[in-house]
Amino acid sequence: PQMADDCLFCKLISGEIPTNKVYEDDICFAFDDIEPEAPVHTLLVPKKHYDDLCDGIPAEVLGHMLSVVPKVAELKGVRESGFRTVMNTGPDSAATVKHFHIHILGGVKMGRFTFENSQRVQD
């Protein structure tokens, strides 16, 4: 797969930097977040480097990755209790690594999403 020289996630995928691997196949790789925001916080990334969801990721790759999410949730013990998936894109999203990834969060009862200065939109 194509990798970016300066990408942290590409270095984790290649084994250049060690990580706690949760799942791997020909298309994607899952590992635990080093700064978890929930008891379970695993990242699922494509092995080929794409900056974000707007970077022309083939539908086959996205579809495969979404089909892997329940497997990762099962491996992490949150498939039955429930989990949240998040994909951040662009500057306002608080994304910190420019390599597309799906956050899989669980292990705790979650509330609504909250945002900086958020207001619920009224109809």
Describe the role of every protein-language-model region.
Residues P1-D123:
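HIT superfamily nucleotide-processing domains
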